[in-house]
Amino acid sequence: MAPSQQEKYDIVIVGAGPVGIVLSLCMSRWGYKVKHIDNRPVPTATGRADGIQPRSTEILRNLGLKRQIMAFKPAKVYDVAFWDPLPGGQGIHRTGSWPSCPRFIDTRYPFTTLVHQGKIERVFLDEIQKAGTTVERPWTIVGFKNDGLDETYPVEVQLKSIDTNVIETVRTKYLFSGEGARSFIRQQLGIQIQYKDPISYVWGVMDGVVRTNFPDIETKCTIHSDAGSIMVIPREDNMVRLYVQIASSDDPDFDPRKTATAEDVQATARKILQPYWVEWDRVEWYSVYPIGQGISEKYTLDERVFMGGDACHTHSPKAGQGMNTAFHDALNMAWKLHAVESGLAKRSILSTYETERKDIAETLLSFDNKYAALFSKRRPTAGEVGEASHTTAAAGGEEDEFVKTFKSSCEFTSGYGVAYKPNVFTWDATHPAQSPLFDVPGVRLTPGRAFTPTTVTRLADSNHVHLEQEIPANGAFRIFIFAGKQDKTSKAITDLAANLEKERSFLSVYRRADIADVSFFENHLPHSKLFSICLVYAGEKNQIDVDSIPKILRDYHHHLYADNIPDVRVPQATYAAHEKLGFDVEKGGVVVTRPDSHVACTVQLSEGSGTVDALNAFFGSFATKPLGQDSQQSRL
């Protein structure tokens, strides 16, 4: 069939696991034509990933999905208990506990949400359907090539119905593999997985309903005993997940292909939990897997065919990072494709998908390797330790290292440790192309990290709102203007507004084509579909003169706020949001966040054109059109 006769798509997504469904939802909602297939006849029914970390919960809320997932009444894990062997082979005892999301991590969701992957998929699939895309099942990919025969849709993809063997050939701008560890697309590209270490541990995982007198069965636990190791994960519907060590490279007869029956794992669990007992009412799901940490050499070869999720990185599931990392992969991919296809960004920016996400995966694997080794390594038996075990030093020293690693890793495992390095989208004060305005004295935000949660009062309706959630995940860059005290910054705000209205400002150059028809009730994108603005004043609502706010900012009538809500993290502050983020209320400041809510840059709020000049310089570094005055020196 000639390319002109083939059905054309903006993107073809293969696989409907975590990375595929997030990417599919974003691209479908943002107006793209998506072809999405999965080789399974039905979505995940049981098992697989089940832990949503705090930062991922924040992302789900920004996607408008948190409420649906919480409707499943998932387990919420606020802390982790550590259990270790008693001396003399007398069983196990609790040696301590630690918050799963310690207070130094600023989050609204200081817990891990536990609900099985199938229920999470169900929520996404319903929303994908509402956005106009259907996941076609069971279909698989049998071939593809970037032949360039169609300049706009350069990739030809061959898909096959598993039920009927019918072959369908389509063309697409992009092809994305969310197929998992056995990715056909990765294999066809000849991209290898680099394994950090040979398989060292084999684990069994079992979901079921249990009866037990073990006191922490509803708490996440790491348990080391003379008989082996277990991790306990509470689940929804009175279930519990047990990860049970089956084999270790420390065993004289270690076999990485070793397997075990569900009954074998139950017997091992009973031994490990002594002196407590455990019995199973039912087993919902059971699997055996080896641990092998690996990462793909490349995430793309041509920036037309991409991969994400387990197709790119494999690791042990006990730190609960697989699904969460996939969410981040997908969101990163989605907003960058949108930036290019909307006409905002040059195609060259797509290279940052691999550099950013592979760097995070490397960090994950480094952490996971250490965490898995500490968790999986067998304790010395009571007989081996002998009388020395009475001091607990022999066993306790190793646990100290495990607990230390766990505590130091909390920020990373929560998702808030993700920090993208400086690049075209992430500018700090050291960026070579900068003006001094990118260095905001006292600011506490770090470019590359997630925007800090803050609570403010929305002027339109006096609602107390979470500022970081006020702009939904719509693919737009977010510009937060912390305007300080209105009487101190009125000229700076007037000048900023006047410069935003100039013909060559980023907001004007990328103005909506349908701006004359935009409804008064368009809360988020009244001027451009690529930028959204929020304005926060330090003061009480009744002290803020809305009429004196320039019209271009007043058009964001649902994005005008008063900074008047106390925050326990800055208890002495009169204006908590400004104080928490490090903005002087006499001067104010501006924060740009990327569409994934990671901080892109911070800019001083200055009189004249300087602030908008700086913003034009930032956006102009990747924009497809020239921004700003030719001299970049204009002043009002």
Swiss-Prot record:
FAD binds at residues 10-39, 241-243, 289, 310. The keyword Flavoprotein applies. Keywords: FAD, Flavoprotein, Membrane, Oxidoreductase, Transmembrane, Transmembrane helix. The keyword Protease does not apply. The chain crosses the membrane at residues 11-28. Binds 1 FAD per subunit. It catalyses: 4-hydroxybenzoate + NADH + O2 + H(+) = 3,4-dihydroxybenzoate + NAD(+) + H2O; 4-hydroxybenzoate + NADPH + O2 + H(+) = 3,4-dihydroxybenzoate + NADP(+) + H2O. Gene3D superfamilies: 3.40.30.20, D-Amino Acid Oxidase, subunit A, domain 2, FAD/NAD(P)-binding domain. It is found in: Membrane. Its cofactor is FAD. Signal peptide: none annotated. Disruption phenotype: Abolishes growth on benzoic acid, benzaldehyde, benzyl alcohol, p-anisic acid, p-anisyl alcohol, and p-hydroxybenzoic acid; and reduces growth on p-coumaric acid and cinnamic acid. Induction: Expression is induced in the presence of caffeic acid, p-coumaric acid, p-hydroxybenzoic acid, protocatechuic acid, and benzoic acid. It is a single-pass membrane protein. It is an enzyme of class 1 (oxidoreductase). Its main location: membrane. Pfam families: FAD_binding_3, Phe_hydrox_dim. It comes from the Eukaryota. FAD-dependent monooxygenase; part of the benzoic acid degradation pathway also known as the protocatechuic acid pathway. Benzoic acid debradation begins with the conversion of benzoic acid into 4-hydroxybenzoic acid through hydroxylation by the benzoate-4-monooxygenase bphA, and its partner NADPH-cytochrome P450 reductase cprA which act as a mediator in electron donation from NADPH. 4-Hydroxybenzoic acid is then converted into 3,4-dihydroxybenzoic acid (also called protocatechuic acid) by the p-hydroxybenzoate-m-hydroxylase phhA. Belongs to the PheA/TfdB FAD monooxygenase family. This is p-hydroxybenzoate-m-hydroxylase A. The lineage of its organism: Eukaryota, Fungi, Dikarya, Ascomycota, Pezizomycotina.
